[in-house]
Design a protein with these regions (language model features):
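Short, charged, intrinsically disordered terminal tails
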Residues: 279-305
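Short beta->alpha hinge that forms the Motif I/post-I loop of the SAM-binding pocket
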Residues: 235
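Active-site core of metal-dependent hydrolases
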Residues: 232
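Acidic/glycine-rich phosphate/pyrophosphate-binding loops and surrounding catalytic core
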Residues: 1-225, 229, 238-246, 252-254, ...
Length: 305
């Protein structure tokens, strides 16, 4: 799994997040990013050490290199040790990442680092639950484009950390004919989807083609042209089974639309190749992480939640 921070988009997003929280108006004499409160109250020579950990069990780690990148962007002299790799499952209060550096710099970096990790760990943890629920059937668990604007690179990476797979990264890397496209193609003729697939292939011969269908009739039309994927949208499990049989050896099948964790196993049992889930990125919430640190000289102790 490629490190998410190798992506230029990820690096740019980290920079934007720090600009949002810290701006560039307040810098110390060495040019470090910092917050106004630390400038006023914290000894510039104070050095702190600490860890990030999950307060609950079963958390799937995601975003450790992002947190490290945040800290290094604030102050390159902060030492960061990754204790648990992305994709690891941790116990309550088990350290994920350790750090040492100027207290002012750590105070400046901590919230942004935690914001990234809390969201990414939540997505990875929810993805893992769906993967575990469907693994008996070998069903792929896919994400969607229902991501937070500007943060897609992190959220889709977090899905990988949880054992899921990425659907298309954007509208540029796969042809996906949804209901609105179908309505605009020959007046929405359900018996002309094979012709739509052929038109898409002529326009973009190097891209996979996927067609969303909502009925057995539409599936029968689409599969004639053998698109790489057929998306079964909001179908009953009984109809999914019929579509899977219809598409066998011709097209892969993707179940989509309102699939909950309770229903995931039943959907996977229909034999679909994959299930796609918007909830992985738009409803995962946030994992309760804590960053605890200690000032090396003196007795001051602090915790940020």
């Amino acid at each position: 799994m490629r490190d998410v921070m190798s992506s230029p988009r990820a690096k740019s997003a980290v920079r934007r997040a720090l600009d949002e929280d810290l701006g560039d108006a307040v810098r110390d004499v060495a040019g470090h990013w910092l917050d106004a409160t630390s400038e006023a109250l914290v000894d510039p020579k104070a050095v702190a050490t600490g860890e990030i950990y999950s307060k609950g069990g079963g958390c799937v780690v995601a975003g450790v290199t992002v947190a490290r990148a945040v800290m290094k962007a604030v102050d390159p002299k902060i030492r960061v040790e990754i204790l648990k790799k992305d994709g690891s499952v941790v116990k309550p209060h088990e350290p994920i990442l350790a750090f040492r550096g100027r207290a002012r710099s750590i105070l400046a970096a901590e919230r942004t680092a935690l914001n990234f990790m809390q969201r990414m760990c939540a997505t990875a943890t929810l993805t893992k639950k769906f993967v575990n629920a469907t693994k008996r059937y070998g069903t792929l668990v896919l994400d969607t484009r229902k991501t937070t604007p500007g943060l897609r690179v992190f959220e889709k990476y977090a899905v990988l950390c949880g054992g899921g797979s990425n659907h298309r990264m954007g509208m540029y890397d796969r042809v996906l004919m949804k209901d609105n496209h179908r309505r605009l193609w020959r007046g929405g003729d359900p018996d002309a989807l094979d012709k739509a697939v052929e038109a898409a292939r002529r326009a973009f011969p190097k891209l996979d083609v996927e067609v969303e269908v909502e009925s057995l009739r539409e599936c029968a039309s689409a599969v004639k042209a053998r698109p790489e994927w057929i998306m079964l949208d909001n179908m009953s499990c009984a109809d999914m089974k019929k579509c899977v049989k219809m598409c066998s050896g011709k097209s892969k099948t993707e179940a989509s639309g309102g699939i909950t964790l309770d229903r995931a196993r039943e959907v996977a049992a229909t034999g679909v190749t994959a299930i796609s889930l918007g909830c992985l990125t738009h409803s995962a919430g946030s994992v309760d992480l804590s960053l605890e640190w200690r000032v090396e000289k003196g007795r001051e102790r602090a915790r940020r939640r």
